[in-house]
Amino acid sequence: MPAALKCQRWTSSSSTTFFPVALNSPDAVEQALREIVAACDVTLLDLRVYPFEPIGVTGVAVVAESHVNIHTWPEYGYAAVDIFTCGGREDPSAAIPTLRECFAPERIETMEMTRGILLDEMVGVAAGDG
């Protein structure tokens, strides 16, 4: 069953000078994506990182099992991380220690979702069974 983990709303009080710098660093976002891919045991196909002006970074890792993306808003001490997998053996929550190590957030809020719940119904309709 496809799985997704969304991590949002990061703040940092103990490392206020480091944290926004990491969130605005294309190199830090790229390294985090590479480490997340390794931690989740997925197959990297492509990785792109885009810095924004005047501030912020978006990075996406396209993996054989789906994708991982990071969007940062350093001015708010905020990052949104989405990890989507569809292979079944992957564990998106394995990325949490990596995120803590790469960005040192004070708090990480997560939401786990299951995707593809309606797949059987949609396949049945597409095949003329519905």
Protein language model annotation of sequence segments:
Residues 1-130:
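Polybasic/polar functional segments that serve as interface/processing modules
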